Amino acid sequence: MKYILMMAGTKAGVDMYRAWSQSDIQRHFAHLKTLNKDLMESGEFVTNEPLAGPEQAKIVRAGKNGVPITDGVFPEAKEFLLGYWIVDVESPERAYQIAARLSAGPGPGGAPINMPIEVRQILSRKTEEL
């Protein structure tokens, strides 16, 4: 079963992260690199991607005659998606274990940040069936 593990954050949280020491940032990224390596070795890794900040996001709708209408950034959003992992695992419990490990990434001084990670199953419909 495939699951998406979504890491969300707030502007305040991102601003705090930007104030971390270089060693704290390196420790955090080493944790993520090790997690990715372990998932690749177990065959559970599908992909992961960081996302640009909300200041670069646009909302697009089809306007008259199908011409796209682009709305600007919505700074009032309380949380925004920072990045995601897609994993292919045997059970929901395994997806939760991976999410907990992701959540426990080190922050300042090496203490776990315990960031909430949203876990959702990816439905396995083929495009032709839609």
Task: Write out the residue ranges for each language-model feature.
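Conserved, structured core segments of small domains
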Residues: 1-130
